[in-house]
Amino acid sequence: MSRRGTAEKRTAKSDPIFRNRLVNMVVNRIMKDGKKSLAYQILYRAVKKIQQKTETNPLLVLRQAIRRVTPNIGVKTRRNKKGSTRKVPIEIGSKQGRALAIRWLLEASQKRPGRNMAFKLSSELVDAAKGGGGAIRKKEATHRMAEANRALAHFR
């Protein structure tokens, strides 16, 4: 344990075009092997496709999708004294929920059939903003699991 004071949290930087922190968070999750410019290209192409599909502000669609996918409650695996594991429901904070939502959106878009990542990501974001798609199903499955194990909430 550190003897110094706690490290101060750094705020996420905003991206150069939209001046938005959320966009930068998504770009950092898309990025593989440090190729940030490629991640920016993928996201900007996806944003352009969203603009063409919905004819609304694509940042609003992105925010709406992330808001819809963000979970309120999740499950954490705990082992009891006898050695059996249980999935204990836990509350999820706003930052962790947003990070999970972005991760689920990207996982769901990668699983989609399609031409390229920008196309798949744009489709997933539009579907999530409307209340459908793989990421929404993942959130609902997590909520169902937490609801089923509600009796174990005192284990934390």
Curated annotation (Swiss-Prot):
One Pfam family hit: Ribosomal_S7
GO annotation (BP), single: translation
GO cellular component: chloroplast; plastid; ribosome; small ribosomal subunit
Keyword terms: Chloroplast, Plastid, Ribonucleoprotein, Ribosomal protein, RNA-binding, rRNA-binding
Cellular compartment(s): Plastid, Chloroplast
Sequence similarity: Belongs to the universal ribosomal protein uS7 family.
Superkingdom of the organism of origin: Eukaryota
UniProt name for this protein: Small ribosomal subunit protein uS7cz/uS7cy
Assembly information from the UniProt record: Part of the 30S ribosomal subunit.
InterPro entries: Ribosomal_uS7, Ribosomal_uS7_bac/org-type, Ribosomal_uS7_CS, Ribosomal_uS7_dom, Ribosomal_uS7_dom_sf
Function: One of the primary rRNA binding proteins, it binds directly to 16S rRNA where it nucleates assembly of the head domain of the 30S subunit.
Gene3D superfamilies on file: Ribosomal protein S7 domain
Example GO molecular function: rRNA binding
Species of provenance: Oryza sativa subsp. japonica
